[in-house]
UniProtKB/Swiss-Prot annotation:
Complexes and interactors: The 4 large subunits of the cytochrome b6-f complex are cytochrome b6, subunit IV (17 kDa polypeptide, petD), cytochrome f and the Rieske protein, while the 4 small subunits are petG, petL, petM and petN. The complex functions as a dimer.
The protein's name: Cytochrome b6-f complex subunit 4
Stored Pfam families: Cytochrom_B_C
Gene Ontology terms: cellular component: chloroplast thylakoid membrane; mitochondrion
Organism (species): Tupiella akineta
Described function: Component of the cytochrome b6-f complex, which mediates electron transfer between photosystem II (PSII) and photosystem I (PSI), cyclic electron flow around PSI, and state transitions.
Domain of life according to the entry: Eukaryota
Gene: petD
Bilayer disposition of the protein: Multi-pass membrane protein
Keyword Cell inner membrane found: no
HAMAP family given in the database record: Cytb6_f_subIV (MF_01344)
Any one Gene Ontology BP term: mitochondrial electron transport, ubiquinol to cytochrome c
SUPFAM superfamilies: a domain/subunit of cytochrome bc1 complex (Ubiquinol-cytochrome c reductase) (SSF81648)
NCBIfam families in the record: cytb6_f_IV
Length: 160
């Protein structure tokens, strides 16, 4: 059972502060209208001006034009698809590859239920979920690096 500290509303000092309007946010200036009407537009327009200025002064290079008659030797997906691309590339059976791809989100869905009794936010107090996260992160990085290499050294990364 979690212990939650609640304010004692029978305390006369606290009741006097609440009567004067001094609750949890009685200091400083109010967010409405000062922040929402005056500061947010300045920040939004400033950010927009920075983005437009960078786009005008230093446009991103699109690259060479596409040539439909010359295809590269190996077509790679975007970088965030490298781990799943590596899974599909190294698993010999197509059905097993699809099942492994479906196992990734299924495994992520089970992580909160592994330690549902322990409600701590600190990862050091949740060793199972932290271990699952670290192993998954290491495997994703390993597979992502391996996807950029030729197929014969992709699993070992050329280290062994």
């Amino acid at each position: 059972m979690a212990v939650i500290k609640k304010p004692d509303l029978t305390d006369p000092v606290l009741r006097a502060k609440l009567a004067k309007g001094m609750g949890h946010n009685y200091y400083g200036e109010p967010a409405w209208p000062n922040d929402l009407l005056y500061m947010f537009p300045v920040v939004i327009f400033g950010s927009f001006a920075c983005v437009i200025g960078l786009a005008v002064l230093d446009p991103a290079a699109v690259g060479e034009p596409a040539n439909p008659f010359a295809t590269p030797l190996e077509i790679l997906p975007e970088w965030y698809f490298y781990p799943t691309f590596q899974l599909l590339r190294t698993v010999p059976n197509k059905l097993l590859g699809v099942l492994l791809m479906a196992a990734v989100p299924a495994g992520l869905l089970t992580v909160p239920f592994i330690e549902n009794i322990n409600k701590f936010q600190n990862p050091f107090r949740r060793p199972i979920a932290t271990t699952v996260f670290l192993i998954g992160t290491f495997a994703a990085i390993w597979l992502g690096i391996g996807a950029c290499l030729p197929i014969d050294i992709s699993l070992t990364l050329g280290l062994f």
